[in-house]
Every structure is written in structure tokens, then in C-alpha cells.
Amino acid sequence: MKRFLWILLPPVLVVVARMHVEWVWFAQFNWQSVLFQRWMLQLLFAGAGSIPVFLAVLWLRAFDRIDDPPRQQKRPIDGMRFSLVLMVSGLAFLACSVVLSDLAILAWKQPFSLSHWQSTGHSMASEWKALLPIQLAIAGVSLCRPQLRRWVAVAMGFALVLVVSRAWGVWSLAWLIPDEGLREPLLGTDLSFGLGRFSAIQLGLELLVLSGTFTTAHAVWGRVTVSPHLSDWSMPALGNRSYRWLSIGVGTNLLGVAGLVWLSRHQLLWHQHGLVAGAGWLQQHLTLPFRSLLAFVLLVLGVSCIVRGIGHLQRLLLLCVAAIVIIESTLTPLTRWLVVRPQELALQAPYLETAIRSTRHGFQLDRIQRRRTEPNVDLTEEDLESGASTLRNVRLWDSGPLLETNRQLQQLRVYYRFSNAAVDRYPLIPDSDTSQQVIISARELDQSALPRRSKTWQNRHFVFTHGNGFTVSPVNTRGTDGLPSYVISDLGSNTRIEGNRDLGIKRKDVEAAIPAQNAALYFGMLPSPYAVVPTEVDEFDYPDGDLNVYSHYAGSAGVPIGSLIQRLCASIYLAEPRLLTTKAIQKDSRVLLRREVRQRIRAIAPFLDLRGDPYLVSVPGDNLELGTSGNRIQHQFWIAEGYTHSATYAYSAAVSKTDSDRYLRNSVKVVVDAYNGSMRLFVSEPDDPIIKSWQKLFPQLFESIESMPNILKAHLLVPEDFFKVQVSQLQRYHVEDPRIFYSGDDVWQVPLEVYGGEQISVEPYHITAQIEGNNSSEFLLLQPLTPLARPNLTAWLAARNDAEHYGELLLIDFPKDRPILGPEQIQALINQDPEVSKVFSLWDGGGSELVQGNLLVLPVGTSLLYVEPVYLKATKGGLPSLVRIVVSDGRGIAMDVNLSAAIDRLIKKTPYGITEGVSTDRLDESRKRSIS
């Protein structure tokens, strides 16, 4: 007994240490109750998962103990029959072992993928597929060794309990999800059935069938391979008791299969059938009746096996099952060819209408406000006056060139990294009713970029603990050398905060709107190891010339490790014994865990799907609740987007072949303190049934979006990832008439443009513009659209970002009877212009490279303005400099060093004086400056 206790001690210590660290980590947010609920749910479902395992063990023990004489009237099982029994039971044993072990691995690594592991064709990760030979080898050897086979059976029992326990989110969602109030027309179920309940029922039935099949196969194989049956290749017929007991096992499995077949009727609702997303005429009138009949026959077959055993009636029912499958497989293509195809539109129109309506609802396209506009042919002075707010914020700097410049001018040390640049708006001009568009980029510490000799344990976890600062540059201007004009740059005591005379921005207004001092970033986008702070070791804060400035963390984040017990738990949790031996730890030391923002959120809310990169905001104010860090006010926060999604939403079309989502909501905005690591989760889609379920389960975790501080709410952005999905679905589902949808003659596409010599799709971009009917300008996310296989501009979709109208979608249709030039056509006109082409050719060569930036289509008054920035950089690692702006109104083209000058040329219709004042010497000088 003592020996057993010593063996048990290490795993118990590991479990206790992990539970302690997790509990304390959740306690820093006052969310211990969330962790406790999750533990209790997993314990509850582990108990529920143990019930079928316990019943299977009882059944196996009872079957193995039966020693009744063979039935004399039955002939022995030999020859081909023996081979068939041996092959079927062996293959079933192997297949169930592999699937159950794969599910256990998936449950351990990605438990929230269990809900769609099969219904959406979930494929195991490649590293798990590499385990297949090992799994087959172990299961194969166990077939030959009874003792090993029993251990495999025990392992499969644990695997089943693990899967059921780790799938707590699947079962909880199914139990708590409210009705949406909308019903699908085929089976009459509420649409919430597909969002939550279907996956849970399917997973439960699949696990029961897998475990039942494994148990039955294990029992049959054990009986068949008992000596001397295998050597004789024959065995006597089973006795009456054994036969009845085996019939009960087979019948139970058949009941599970019947349930899966009955449930598969719902799968017709979210499988694409030709043009119809969901069940069409053929599925309703042929597939559905056959599946219902098949489920009924399997149900009768299963019940009869349990009640009467396997006999002539059961064999007849089995033949009926085969006949139903064959008849359906034969009739389906015949009916499609002879009945549906000749009158497809008439038969499918009601189903197409349902699919259009459901797809639009699944991706919130039904919220779109649609308007029609007819832009003027020429850009006029009146347009410039009414569109002044738009022209003041035209984005001339793309993220790519700006990040390149940041990395060369602002990283300052090899271990700093600018991984993302986000477009945002800040009130930098107090008297203006329009916020200034800027690009903000965080300077994070990249541990992987440390020199090899510097990658010591102490450096990685005690010294290089955080990034520092950020850059802010207006989107619509450049410096005298063509480089970005920063209003905030550099870091630490050398942080430069500047105004911009051309834009009317004053330094004091920048300081008031964007706090930049003490901007230590302990939590960020980049993966970071744990950090131990504060300690006896000085933390690197920032470089100051040739010297380094050091600091100590003064926040409240982290798990305390001041006492010996706390250090022991942390060292076990992190598998790091050096935490016990180092002398750098002091009484108030803590270990910062999960410092990557998305990892941090997933630990708290694993049911949220996090897409896209979090973006940094820096805001004034000392009453943000989650922003206080000891005696220090923290102003930098990360905002991340949390989604709820489903691949089983009735009659909704999937996004693509690789993205099976049929329902998507940007339901949660997560704000993370960049210094203190505190988090708040704000519900931005309170009507979403899925997020309602999680609010019921964890009410302490969520807040309404109305409770978000206004200073943060002013920086909310419609996420580009969500917007792109909506644009993708809109390309076909902007049509609401089934006849037009069926004809396919009004399909849209995202236009193409040439960027850096490569043809790419036009990305969504932000503009500040005044919507018709509004008195003030708004911050919009815009996507131009063109007809399929035609370059003319047909529409654009705009997402509104400002608080009052946040998330509203506006679709602007352009006239079909007059061609409006699209981005691809305008770019072709620019490149074909002889004067422009001459200048471009002059720059693009001799060690320099010309890059035509993103072409923007902007509403200016009642006209359209096309704007394309032009960058010049050295071929090998040069700084991209903004050298020219090309503009067009669809008729004329003009180019100059800044936007206002280029527009002035366009309005005055100056005959292509685009090289005026730009001598070859100046071009050479620009090239040299870029190269240097």
C-alpha cells in the first residue's frame, strides 16, 4: 500500500500545483467562480461519461463469465464465416481504438472543436495523423495479447470519460441556448437547434456508438480467439445465454445508429445541394422520407435484437436496411435528372428564397441599408467643398510601407518588433468636428530576436520582460523627405511628441489625446514566455543612446511566488526547477503568465473564436477601472474581437470550401490592459443566442457594451475579418429575388489592383466621409465591388464605426446604365498615360524600386475621386518614401507631390504637367536618399 501511495504522490502533486496556480491566476480578475464552475462541470460530465463505461464493464464481465454449452441445432462457425467474424470484430476494434484516441487528443488540445469534429469534416492536425501508425500498432498487438487488450480497453474507457468531460462547453451550450424565435420550414425546429443542440446530440450518439461497438468487438474477438478456436479456424455456435447477451450489445449499438440516421435529416439543412444552401425539392421529397424510413427500420431492428435476439426477422430487417440504401442511391440521380433539372427554377424557387433569407440573416446582411447614387462625371469645386472632411483624412500610407519604415527607423534595437499597424482616429484638432485618422503601431519585445548568447534563462524571464512605446503617424501627410510624419515616435525619455503644422495639429493636443509616457507593454500580440517581476534583477526598460535604462514592474498582475510553497507550485506548473534555486526572487515577486493577449483571453473564455490581430489604443483618463496599476495610471489597452460562429445554421450558405461557417457574430469586445493584464469582456451582440447561453452560464464574466468607458468606445472598429466575410457573402446574396439568383447574372466580386508589381484583391480601407443625409462626417470601413468578370464599379459596402451607428452597414449602388470605372480600370489608365509611364520608368530602375500603393475610391461630394500613393525605395532594404500622389476623377489624371496639389491639377485640367518642377537631378536625389 505504501508503495502505491509513493507512486501516486507525483501526479497528485502536479494536479494540486496546477490547480493552485490556475486558481490564483483567475483570482487576479476576481473570476475564481468561473474556474470553479468549469471544474465542477468537468467533474459532473466525467461522472456522466463514467456511466456507459461502467455499464460496458458490467456487460463485458457478464459476457466473459457465461460458460453455457453451444446450441446443438446450430452448426459450428467455421471457414468463411469464422474469417468474416474475425475480420469484422478485429477491424471494428482497431477503428474504434483509433477514433476514440484521436478524439481524446482533440479533447485535450482543442475541446471546443469537438462540437464539429465530424459534421464539418474536421480533420485532425498533422501531428496527430503521425500517431496513426503507433495507434494501429498498439491496437494490433493487443489483439494478439489478451492482457494488453484489456489495458487498451481501460485506456479507451479513460478516453471516453476525458472526451465527455472536456466537452463541457458542448453540453452546456445545448442545455442553455435559448430559442431564436425563427423556425426552418422543413422539419419545423427552431434555428437555435442547429446553433447549439444538434452538435451535442450528435457527439453524444457518436460516443455511445463508438464505445458500444468497441465493447462488442472486444467481447467477440476475445471469444473467437480463445484456444483452440484460432488454430482450428473454427468455433462452436454460441450458447443461448451468450447469444442473447451478444444480441443485447448489438441491438444497443443499432439504436445509437438509428438515432444518428434520424439526426442526419437535420444535416440536409446545412449541406449545399446545387444552388440551394440547405435542403431543396429533391431532399424534401426523396431523401428525407428515405432517411426517416431507414431510421425507423433500424430502430425496430435494434429493439427486436434486444427483445428477441438475432434471428430470421432481424436478418429480414437487415435486408430492408440494405434495400432502402440501394433504392435511395439509385433514385436520387434519376429523380434529379428526370424531374428536377427540366423544371429546376419552378421547383427550387421556394427553397432558394429560404436560403437567401437565412444566409443574409446568418451574416447580418439583412441589416444592410441600401441606397442608390449617381456620381457626377467630373469633380467640381463644389464637390471639393462639400467633401472637405473626406479629403482631410485620405490615407496615403499603406500599412506595409509604414511598417517597413518603422522597422528601420523606430525599432531601435534588434529585439523590438512592430508586428501590426492599425488605422484609428483620435481628436487631435479640438476645434474640428472630425477626428484625425492615424496609424498606430506598438513596439513590442520579440524574445525570438534576442542574440543567441543573450537567450539565457535569466534574460528571457527576468530582464527582457516587456516592450515599450508605440508610434503614431497621420495617414494623410508625409515629411519633407517623403518618410512618414510622426506625431509620436522614439521611446522612453527620448519620446518625441510633435504637432503637424500642415494639418493644424498642435503638440499639446497630441499630448492630451494620446498619452505616450511610461508606455511599458507587458502584455501584447507577440508570443512571450512567462516573466518573473519584480525581482532583485533589474528589468530592461528602454535604450537611452548607448546606455540602457532599467526599471521594476509596479503593477498588480501575476501569480505570487514570494513563499516557498508558492514557488514550489509555480516550478511544478512551469516545469522549471530553477525557480526554487534562484536568489533573485523577493517577497513581492510574481510570475506573469499568458502574456499574449489572445492566449490570455482563450484561458478565460475558450468558447470565443478570436480572429484578426488585437489593436492598441492609448487613451487619457484615470477612471477606466481596469487601467490602474498600483500608483501608476495605465493608458495603453489592447482591443480584441471575440466571435461566436456555427457551421450548422439551417439554410445558410458556407463562406467558402475552406471556411464552413454558416453563422457568424462579432459578439464580444475584449479590452486588455497592456501593463496590468486586466480584462473586461463587453457583449456587443446581445441578441446572439450563443452569447446569451454563455452569459447565463457565466454572468460574472460579461458586461454590456453600454458599460464600456466612452473614451474606449470611441476607438471601437468594425473588424476587417468580419467585414470581409460579409463582403464575401454579399457578392451573391445581395440578390433577394430567387429568379435573378438562379440565373446568376448579378454576381459581384472584389476588384483587383496591382500592388508592388503583383495583382491582388482590393482590401477594405478606412475613410472619413459624410454620408448623405448626415450633417457630420463618419469613420467608415469601405469595400468597392464590381460585377463578376467585369471591372466596372457597381457598388460599395460601408461599415459605420462611430459609436452612435456602430456596426451599421450601408450598401451604395451605382447606376447600371452608365459605366463607372473600377480600380482596375483606373490603374490601367494611370499606367497607360505616357507622361506618368515616363516618370515611373525613370524611377523604377538603377537600384530603386517603384511601388504603386493601394488605389482608393472615395466619395467626394457628389463625385468620385480615385487616389493612388506612389512609393520609392531601394531594391535592397531601402526605406519606402512617399514620392507622388496620383489622382483621377475617371476622366482626367493628375500627379503631384501632395494630394492638394494633385487635386488642384485635376480640377484645373492642367495638360499633364506632371514632371514640371521635377528634374532628373531631383529624381536621382530622391532615389539616392531612398537608397541611403
From Swiss-Prot:
Species per Swiss-Prot/TrEMBL record: Synechococcus sp. (strain CC9902)
Keywords, alphabetical: Cell membrane, Membrane, Transmembrane, Transmembrane helix
Transmembrane segments: 4-24, 40-60, 85-105, 124-144, 151-171, 201-221, 243-263, 293-313, 315-335
Any Gene Ontology CC annotation: extracellular region
Membrane topology: Multi-pass membrane protein
One Pfam family of this chain: UPF0182
Protein's name in the database: UPF0182 protein Syncc9902_1151
HAMAP family from the UniProt entry: UPF0182
Domain of life: Bacteria
Compartment annotation: Cell membrane
Family statement drawn from the similarity comment of this UniProt entry: Belongs to the UPF0182 family.
